[in-house]
Amino acid sequence: MNKEERAKRQSKIRNFSIIAHIDHGKSTLADRILEKTNALTQREMKAQLLDSMDLERERGITIKLNAVQLNYKAKDGEEYILHLIDTPGHVDFTYEVSRSLAACEGAILVVDAAQGIEAQTLANVYLALDNNLEILPVINKIDLPSADPERVRQEVEDVIGLDASEAVLASAKAGIGIEEILEQIVEKVPAPTGDSEEPLQCMIFDSLYDPYRGVIAYIRVVNGTVKVGDKVRMMATGKEFEVTEVGVFTPKTTQRDELTVGDVGFLAASIKNVGDTRVGDTITHAKRPAAEPLPGYRKLNPMVFCGLYPIDSARYNDLRDALEKLELNDSALEFEPETSQALGFGFRCGFLGLLHMEIIQERIEREFKIDLITTAPSVIYKVFLTNGEDMIVDNPSNMPDPQTIDRVEEPFVKAAIMVPNDYVGAVMEICQGKRGTFIDMQYLDETRVTLTYEIPLSEIVYDFFDQLKSNTKGYASFDYELIGYKPSKLVKMDILLNSEQVDALSFIVHRDSAYDRGKVIVEKLKELIPRQQFEVPIQATIGNKVVARSTIKAMRKNVLAKCYGGDISRKRKLLDKQKEGKKRMKSVGSVEVPQEAFMAVLKMDDN
């Protein structure tokens, strides 16, 4: 293509993504848009087409972002090229959303006509505003009996401050309003700016690993043009490769000769080493490089850490490969090797949140067929020592001796919880139980309230979300951001089995609740650890002080079975002999700890 053709084509490109709270109908709307633009034949169409991972389809949530190119003939008779970049809605995957938005000029904001605005809707809107996107509100599910589009339209104006007078009323399920949405995209979303003659700049917004083609980078071309056979350079790593194929997704990968300004597609360059491409990096030509990389994303810091260990220790290297491949596709994951006396070799992994952690575990077990043991999740603590030094602790077993500690600081988050009026009391109770500090309360309308609390992250990590959902019948929605570290009275609690410390069961707890937590956990472990041939004491200790203890009784054989009647001294002798044997066994015996016991440390608040 020559310069004029490229410029004409560029003016007809529209890049947009769809943002919404979980379950407001994002993926269904994406399906309808694909149908309307005839991207697929009827036979290929299936529900939630862009959610390609099995896990996504099972849980009905979008985890990964996806991109597709569509052709649309608008009412003005022109052919437009639309790039739809689908995004997740769950708080743990905000990172995926911010990456998709960086590749767009516009966003469709989907709001449920019955439920109105929820916490995640707001969080995603702010991300879109940060990226200066044109936002088109769409009120979805208007065919529901409980739908109240006018109230929601008012809410969009009041709460977000967007003009919703032209908001499309739609029902993705029934296919109402889809054409209006497409027309608004063509009219209101700006065409990409950029120059096809400038040095090449492509933003990598995702990548995946193909065993035959190497790493495939999903890119958005900002300036310049990239063709097959070009030598390209990754600006962050400085590595150079020759492009073997470029193309677009129509959801299927379709090869093209070149990608130019505004295109969203993929690039493969037989990159075999996973570490050579970084999501958020800029690709440029090796011969005529761009002066500087595109502003990348801010690197997200993991909030939650846990240990992952293969049940079969021979598969340690397989687990490393699995994590490396997942990291390529999920740049928010971090991991480093660690060892535990109880569990052997494994990795300490960092995640954005609990859902993220669960998904990664499930993907490793499914896609790579590795059985895992996971330890209790923890957060990063800052420990200041009496000698003036400070250290960072992300694993409870690395906590220094209590005598040497001056103070411990833990991360706090500001949590915004949206909840119907009737449940305000229940939510406040949960937050106070989690050592939360009340900050603010605002009414959105007559029926809904936003509560703002400062809560230690470690309290949210366990089961805050589950409690919130169950105590508000699923109506509360919740979003949080890190605000920094504050000192807390924290102590490390160790669990001893048969007088031996099990490092993987240690956890850090607030001093005020230490005694209760210790009591609960030893009782729980007593139920979960199978009975042995000898008596096993379970102790919870802080430093060298035991705060709770419980004993698993020994199983024993009835050694008196063969004495019919008989003399008491004869029975005594047999019983003493048995006792002696048990004692010997106890001094050498070790106790197997089942996986449920490690998880019990987490699920303490069920009772």
UniProtKB/Swiss-Prot annotation:
SMART domains xrefs: EFG_C (SM00838)
Every tr-type G domain range: 11-193
Originating organism: Bacillus cereus (strain ATCC 10987 / NRS 248)
PANTHER family: TRANSLATION FACTOR GUF1 HOMOLOG, CHLOROPLASTIC, TRANSLATION FACTOR GUF1-RELATED
PROSITE patterns: G_TR_1, G_TR_2
Role description: Required for accurate and efficient protein synthesis under certain stress conditions. May act as a fidelity factor of the translation reaction, by catalyzing a one-codon backward translocation of tRNAs on improperly translocated ribosomes. Back-translocation proceeds from a post-translocation (POST) complex to a pre-translocation (PRE) complex, thus giving elongation factor G a second chance to translocate the tRNAs correctly. Binds to ribosomes in a GTP-dependent manner.
Keyword Membrane applies: yes
CDD domains referenced in this protein's UniProt entry, alphabetically: EF4_II, EF4_III, LepA, lepA_C
Binding site for GTP: 23-28, 140-143
Molecular functions per Gene Ontology: GTP binding; GTPase activity; ribosome binding; translation elongation factor activity
Localization per record: Cell membrane
Membrane topology, from the record: Peripheral membrane protein
HAMAP family in alphabetical order: LepA (MF_00071)
Family according to the record: Belongs to the TRAFAC class translation factor GTPase superfamily. Classic translation factor GTPase family. LepA subfamily.
Keywords: Cell membrane, GTP-binding, Hydrolase, Membrane, Nucleotide-binding, Protein biosynthesis
The name this protein goes by in its record: Elongation factor 4
The keyword Protein transport belongs to this UniProt entry's keyword annotation: no
Primary residence: membrane
EC number: 3.6.5.n1
Protein encoded by which gene: lepA
GO cellular component: plasma membrane
GO biological process: positive regulation of translation
Catalytic activity: GTP + H2O = GDP + phosphate + H(+)
